[in-house]
A protein has these predicted regions:
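Membrane-targeting and insertion segments and their boundary/processing signals
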Residues: 16-17, 83, 87, 144
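Outer membrane beta-barrel transmembrane domains
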Residues: 47-81, 96-110, 114, 120-217
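Short, surface-exposed connector motifs at secondary-structure boundaries
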Residues: 89-93
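Outer-membrane beta-barrel channels and translocator barrels
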Residues: 37-41, 85-87, 118-120, 174-177
Length: 218
């Protein structure tokens, strides 16, 4: 697969808060995958993705956020599927390794159990663990003394942290319509990271989420 995007950036209140007036950024992605049928009830897939970003990659809404204008990202994803005939259920397991030249490496592991209750109803519990290292230029406090051309960012998404999430979805297939009700709990903390944390972020989040979705297929 291949994709390309080009974005024009026009931050609001740019002149009031001394933000950039306008910038642009570009992203090119390519992915290759291989699937293998293991048996009548199980399969495995491996995928390798590469993304190149260039242009304005900083956050214009932060007071001191200066990032490199190029970023190379690579991701390796492994997916395993198995159907349990007697239980009338499917087990999905995924693992993803990610690395970029900002200095971030991450591991993502998630599992889902698709339990068929009736022909048109599914119950889907899920768990997910995520861990990442910090970007080489991450700082938990903005340093306004640093030169304007020296990289730094206090964005918590660039810090070293880990996160656990668990959820439960109820899926009903109603002919051409599919209704989904999902409840999820998400907790992130620097102590959950599998990597060294030299500067913990103070902006990591935790939340409860309930969502309702309705899809139509034609």
């Amino acid at each position: 697969g291949f994709s390309y995007s080009s974005d024009a950036i026009f931050p609001t209140d740019a002149e009031v808060f001394n933000r950039v007036i306008s910038e642009d950024k570009r992203s090119t992605s390519a992915i290759i995958s291989v699937s293998q049928i293991i048996s009548q009830v199980s399969s495995f897939q491996i995928a390798l993705g590469l993304t190149e970003q260039s242009g304005f990659l900083s956050d214009p809404y932060k007071l001191k956020d200066i990032r490199p204008d190029n970023r190379t990202q690579i991701a390796l994803t492994n997916s395993y599927r198995h159907f349990f005939i007697n239980a009338n259920a499917a087990w999905h397991v995924n693992y993803r390794y990610y690395h970029d030249d900002f200095g971030i490496s991450s591991h993502t592991f998630d599992m889902r159990w698709y339990q068929n209750l009736r022909q048109s109803i599914q119950l889907v519990p899920s768990v997910r663990f995520y861990s990442q290292s910090a970007a080489s230029f991450f700082t938990n406090i903005d340093n306004f003394v640093k030169p304007a051309d020296e990289y730094q960012s206090s964005d918590h998404r660039l810090s070293a942290f880990g996160a656990f999430s668990g959820g439960l979805s109820f899926v009903a297939n109603l002919g051409s319509w599919t209704a989904t009700l999902t409840a999820e709990r998400y907790v992130s903390n620097d102590s959950y990271s599998a990597y060294k944390v030299s500067q913990p972020s103070t902006a990591l989040v935790r939340y409860n989420r309930i969502s309702v979705g309705l899809d139509y297929t034609f």
